[in-house]
């Protein structure tokens, strides 16, 4: 994009109200999650790193560097509150950051309002309706499009499977399937129209300074949607999206009819997720703008040019980096510790004897009270249970564990098999109980590390205690056999001391409903890293995630299908939408 010459930021949303001598310009913004906007305000600074977008950032902030409050742009936003997929909660006010998917996020509305008001020099009202995960072919289906029907190519496949198949309902269930489609069709189209009517019927409710004598003008509509249709292979088989073009043309006609605005300027925000990929879908989205009946009042704005390739390149590296730093140790395919992993030499075990020589004392118990028993299979099995009498303080240093079983870790049972790794040989056997209580003692000579962590192998959740104090709880599960890395904060580390330390763990086993043999493995150790070794590790990790990658990721707060939650991307999109609307009006 070429640099945009702008006036000072103060002129974009001036601090004194503009006269309502001219009609209030009302713009409608509608779509799904990318119209909601998942760009966190924490990514604003990244906009200023690029000289081409720096002026946009200046327009988005006030003199104190805070998100600008536009004194002459108001907004009513429906769909971003509560359950963002279905709720009809409304948020109103003067336009600023926080009218995105959450109070700390923006979508296209922020810069759309800033730049439309700047150019038109009249007060602006934005009516935004957006719900996540909603399609045009069902949820926003326009009335004139007719009943949802399967494409012939898909119907031909269904006809071959009257008894049903994967993704194909049985013949006797298809009437109900169609009824469900019909019931869902157009629900969010109607909600959109109803909300626009509600707001325009009583504009003062949203815009207290509205001049009723001057009135208002429906000045434009922006449609920014598409992801759920893009990935719907049933409705659009074989990458053919002609039906989307047909539906969108009906949508434009119906919106204009239902809002009594036959020439309402209409902007199609062409989905740009993944940049210049998804060519067939992007062409189908843009196609209505080329129809003769829409010439001069419908325009397609391609958002692919705003895709950030630096962020796109960095995000997969971030995933790899996170996997490395969240893993303390890996296992070989035979379940033994992989001592050749290149990242393992920087963190060192704390205390003696060394973890592999340390003796644990342990006992297993079962849930006996009704409230503690799981009546059906649940992937998340970890829970607290009532322990047998006398074991309430089992994790404290003074507890007498002399009658418990002794052995080295990992303590386990059964076969834990995942990701090509088979863990079925253990120095110590877990026993029959579902829950394991284990304790060990180690001596610490000095505390000269800069950071400390728990390195733990566990199939299910766990509590970890250090000298009687709980220092970590994990309630989920771990599919792949490996040692997780949990870096400890000051509140946890203060319980580590010179001399004798008692480390204790509470954990439970796992089973598969298709193979009811219970299995488990547990091992835990405290490890530390010096400042010098941390610097060496950070330098080594730059081969995975470079300083350039880290800088790019400052501009991201979400996944790629949400344009990385990048304010830089959404700011450019909103500005482009505003400029397109203004040009249509000219």
Regions found by a protein language model. Name each.
Residues 21-219, 224-354, 443, 531-576, ...:
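Conserved, well-structured interaction surfaces
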Residues 431-445, 484-488:
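Short beta-strands within extracellular/lumenal beta-sheet-rich domains
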Residues 466-489:
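Solvent-exposed beta-strand/loop surfaces of large extracellular or lumenal domains
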Residues 1-7:
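Bacterial N-terminal signal peptides that target proteins for export
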Residues 40-53, 337-391, 477, 490-545:
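An acidic-aromatic loop/edge-strand motif
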Residues 404, 442-468, 503:
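Aromatic-lined ligand-binding clefts that engage carbohydrates, nucleic acids, or primary amines
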């Amino acid at each position: 994009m070429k640099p945009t010459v702008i006036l000072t930021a103060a002129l974009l949303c001036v601090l004194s109200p503009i006269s309502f001598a001219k009609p209030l310009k009302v713009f409608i913004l509608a779509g799904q999650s990318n119209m909601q906007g998942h760009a966190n305000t924490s990514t604003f600074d990244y906009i200023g790193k690029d000289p081409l977008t720096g002026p946009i950032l200046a327009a988005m902030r006030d003199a104190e560097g805070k998100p600008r409050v536009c004194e002459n742009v108001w907004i009513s936003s429906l769909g971003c509150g509560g359950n963002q997929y279905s709720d009809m909660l409304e948020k109103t006010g003067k336009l600023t950051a926080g009218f995105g998917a959450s109070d700390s996020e923006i979508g296209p509305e922020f810069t759309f309002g800033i730049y439309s008001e700047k150019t038109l020099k009249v007060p602006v009202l934005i009516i935004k309706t957006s719900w996540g995960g909603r399609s045009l072919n069902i949820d926003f289906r326009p009335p004139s499009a007719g009943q949802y029907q399967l494409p012939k190519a898909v119907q031909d496949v269904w006809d071959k499977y009257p008894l049903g198949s994967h993704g194909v309902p049985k013949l006797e269930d298809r009437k109900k399937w169609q009824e469900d489609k019909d019931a869902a069709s157009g629900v969010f189209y109607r909600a959109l129209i109803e909300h626009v009517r509600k707001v325009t019927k009583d504009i003062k409710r949203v815009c207290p300074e509205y001049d009723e004598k001057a009135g208002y003008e429906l000045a434009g509509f922006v449609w920014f949607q598409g992801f759920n249709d893009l990935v719907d292979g049933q409705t659009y088989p074989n990458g053919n999206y002609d039906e989307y073009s047909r539906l969108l043309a009906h949508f434009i006609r119906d919106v204009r009819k239902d809002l009594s605005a036959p020439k309402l300027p209409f902007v199609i925000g062409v989905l740009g997720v993944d940049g210049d990929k998804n060519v067939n879908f992007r062409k189908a989205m843009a196609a209505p703008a080329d129809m003769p009946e829409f010439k001069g009042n419908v325009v397609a704005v391609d958002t692919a040019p705003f895709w950030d390739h630096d962020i796109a390149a960095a995000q997969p590296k971030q995933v790899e980096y996170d996997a490395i730093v969240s893993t303390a140790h890996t296992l070989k395919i035979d379940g033994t510790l992989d001592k050749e992993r290149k990242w393992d030499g920087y963190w060192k075990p704390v205390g003696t004897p060394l973890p592999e020589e340390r003796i644990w004392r342990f006992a297993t118990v079962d849930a006996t009270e009704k409230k503690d028993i799981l009546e059906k299979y649940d992937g998340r099995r970890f829970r607290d249970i009532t322990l047998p009498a006398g074991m309430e303080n089992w994790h404290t240093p003074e507890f007498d564990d002399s009658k418990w079983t002794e052995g080295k870790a990992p303590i386990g049972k059964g076969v834990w098999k995942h990701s090509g790794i088979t863990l079925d040989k253990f120095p110590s056997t877990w026993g029959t109980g579902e829950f394991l209580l284990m304790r060990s003692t180690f001596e610490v000579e000095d505390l000269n590390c800069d950071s400390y962590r728990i390195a733990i192998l566990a199939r299910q959740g766990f509590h970890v205690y250090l000298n009687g104090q709980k220092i970590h709880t994990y309630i989920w599960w771990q599919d792949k056999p490996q040692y997780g890395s949990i870096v400890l904060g000051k509140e946890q580390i203060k319980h580590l001391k010179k001399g004798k330390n008692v480390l204790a763990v509470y954990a439970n086993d796992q089973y598969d409903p298709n193979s009811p043999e219970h299995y488990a493995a547990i091992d835990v150790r405290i490890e530390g890293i010096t400042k010098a070794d941390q610097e060496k590790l950070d330098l080594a990790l730059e081969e995975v995630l470079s300083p350039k990658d880290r800088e790019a990721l400052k501009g991201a707060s979400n996944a790629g299908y949400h344009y990385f939650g990048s304010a830089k991307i959404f700011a450019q999109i909103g500005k482009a939408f505003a400029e397109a609307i203004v040009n249509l009006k000219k």
